[in-house]
Amino acid sequence: MDDAHKSPSDKGGETGESDETAAAPGDPGATDTDGIPEDTDGDADADLKEAAAEEGELKSQDISDLTTVEREDSSLLTPAAKKLKIDTKEKKEKKQKVDEDEIQKMQILVSSFSEEQLNRYEMYRRSAFPKAAIKRLIQSITGTSVSQNVVIAMSGISKVFVGEVVEEALDVCEKWGEMPPLQPKHMREAVRRLKSKGQIPNSKHKKIIFF
C-alpha cells in the first residue's frame, strides 16, 4: 500500500536515475578522444617551419631597417660635413702616399752611402741619450716632475740637435783641410756657425733697452 501511494515525482526520480545509469556505459554524446591518435610530429614540424620563417622575416626586416637608417644618416649630413669627411679621407690617403715616398727615398739614400757613411748612420740610429739623465736634467731646470712622454720627446730632440752639431763640425773639419776625428775646436766653430744662422737660440737673455 505504501508503494502505491508514492508520489509521481518520487517515481520519476528513480526512473531518471536508472536511465542515467543505463545511458552512462554507452553514451553516444561522449567523444572517445583516447581512441584517436594525435598527430604531434606533424604539428611540431609545422611549428618549427613557422618559427624559422618568422625568424627569417625578422632578420630581413632588421637588415632593411639598418640600410634605411644608414641612408637617412648619409642624407642628413650637411654639405660641410660631407666635404669634411671627403677631405679627411683624401688627407689620409695623401699622408700614406707621402710616407711611402719618404721610405722609398730613404732606401735609395741608404743604398748610395759609402761604408763610412753607412757606419755613421747605423751608429746614429742606435744611439740614444739615457732617459734617466734627461729626466733629472729637466726636473733640475723646471723644478717639477715630468711625464715619460716629455722625457722621450726631449731625448729625441737632443739627439737631433747633437746630430746637427756633429754634421756642421764635420763640414768645418773638411773646410779647414783637416781629417777626423773631430776636435773641440771643430765643435766650437760648428756651434758658432749654427748660432749665426739662427739655428741655435741664444741661451743668454739680453735685456732690450729703449732709448
From Swiss-Prot:
Residue span of region Disordered: 1-74
InterPro entries, sorted: Histone-fold, TAF11-like, TAFII28_dom
Family of this protein: Belongs to the TAF11 family.
Subcellular location(s) of the protein: Nucleus
Protein name: Transcription initiation factor TFIID subunit 11
Domain of life: Eukaryota
Segments forming a coiled coil: none
Assembly mode: Component of the TFIID basal transcription factor complex, composed of TATA-box-binding protein TBP, and a number of TBP-associated factors (TAFs), including TAF1, TAF2, TAF3, TAF4, TAF5, TAF6, TAF7, TAF8, TAF9, TAF10, TAF11, TAF12 and TAF13. Interacts with TAF13 both in vitro and intracellularly; also interacts directly with TBP.
Domain remark in the UniProt entry: TBP and TAFII18 bind to distinct domains of TAFII28.
SUPFAM superfamilies: Histone-fold
Pfam families the record matches: TAFII28
Family annotation (PANTHER family): TATA-BOX BINDING PROTEIN ASSOCIATED FACTOR 11 LIKE PROTEIN 2-RELATED, TRANSCRIPTION INITIATION FACTOR TFIID SUBUNIT 11-RELATED
Compositional bias per record (Basic and acidic residues), positions renumbered to this chain: 1-14, 46-74
This protein's record includes keyword Endoplasmic reticulum: no
Function: The TFIID basal transcription factor complex plays a major role in the initiation of RNA polymerase II (Pol II)-dependent transcription. TFIID recognizes and binds promoters with or without a TATA box via its subunit TBP, a TATA-box-binding protein, and promotes assembly of the pre-initiation complex (PIC). The TFIID complex consists of TBP and TBP-associated factors (TAFs), including TAF1, TAF2, TAF3, TAF4, TAF5, TAF6, TAF7, TAF8, TAF9, TAF10, TAF11, TAF12 and TAF13.
Modified residues (N-acetylmethionine): M1
Molecular function GO labels: protein heterodimerization activity; RNA polymerase II general transcription initiation factor activity
Keyword terms, alphabetized: Acetylation, Nucleus, Transcription, Transcription regulation
Cellular component aspect of the GO annotation: transcription factor TFIID complex
Gene Ontology BP annotations: RNA polymerase II preinitiation complex assembly
Bias-annotated ranges (Acidic residues): 35-45
